[in-house]
Amino acid sequence: MEKFDLHILGCGSALPTQKHFPPSQVVDLRDKLFMIDCAEGTQLLVRKQKLKFSRLNHIFISHLHGDHCFGLIGLLSTFDLLGRTSKLHIYSPGEDLEKLLRPQIDYFCRGMGYEVVFHAVPHK
């Protein structure tokens, strides 16, 4: 089995507290980062773990509760400010996340230097 690292950025709370952050994890596999959920404050925790934003190209949102996706628009904006050019893929149940985020991206991240590709994962 191939070695991978799992970074627990937040778990155990829908609300940020002094001891717990809302859910977000990063899997480090084959020199690539895969994020599972992106809660409020996630990008600060990524920096604290010294993970490179440039290695993150895939984000998976488990379900559409705010504590699992409120950090996305800030992270997308930060990527643009850092000069990102590679595509970012975001996977989520159904098409609702793109419907919610696309207007925010168009408004807050107008002229972004990279493409965000949404993938709707069908409900079972």
Language model segments and positions:
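Binuclear metal-dependent hydrolase catalytic cores
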Residues: 1-124
